[in-house]
Amino acid sequence: MHCPFCQNPDTKVIDTRISDDGHSIRRRRECPNCGARFSTLETTMLLVKKRSGNVEQFDRNKVIAGVRKACQGRPIHEDDLKRLGQQVEEDLRARGVAQVPSDEVGKAILRPLKDLDEVAYLRFASVYQNFEDLEDFQHAIDALRDSDKMLVSACPAGQAETSISCGYQLSMTRVRIVPVMASSASMVTSSGHLVTSVTT
């Protein structure tokens, strides 16, 4: 590798460390010509094939940005979003393929998001799964309730153990969840929020 300081074509590695998540390698290099030291980061590329057919490199920050929109107004910290983004990337990399469809990224987000916050899950799912009316919301809410019942019945002492499987950016403009003060046609969720479909 060329030295970024003197452009000498030869540098040597003096230290190598694997990142905590195991997905990248940090190397410390030294230039024998000018003596300068610098670091490089090596990582495998994970590609995402979009519905348009275009292929782009997976970006964990895009996952976090998309989920952050669904979590607006919810008691979710930035650290929670970072952990979810890491879970999504780990899940996709664990599949052992170099390229994944964008739909699979969405599915990988939904699983841990449901465990993190059910309201945010409904917001994200409404866009990812293209909800068209209140009936779609009702089906999603019923599915949430059924999954909660299964978890409780399967665990001793009434404590459900959630299996957080590792979970791209979607625009959150089609649907919103507002406080129970609105007068429009709506439906109240178990968490005390009114689900209202809106168009933009």
Swiss-Prot record:
Domain ATP-cone: 46-136
Cofactor dependence: Zn(2+)
PROSITE patterns cross-referenced by the UniProt entry: ATP_CONE
GO biological process, one term: negative regulation of DNA-templated transcription
Domain of life: Bacteria
unnamed zinc-finger residues: 3-34
Record's cofactor remark: Binds 1 zinc ion.
Keywords: ATP-binding, DNA-binding, Metal-binding, Nucleotide-binding, Repressor, Transcription, Transcription regulation, Zinc, Zinc-finger
A GO molecular-function annotation: ATP binding
Protein's job: Negatively regulates transcription of bacterial ribonucleotide reductase nrd genes and operons by binding to NrdR-boxes.
Similarity comment text for this entry: Belongs to the NrdR family.
UniProt-recorded name of the protein: Transcriptional repressor NrdR
Lineage per the UniProt record: Bacteria, Bacillati, Actinomycetota, Actinomycetes, Bifidobacteriales
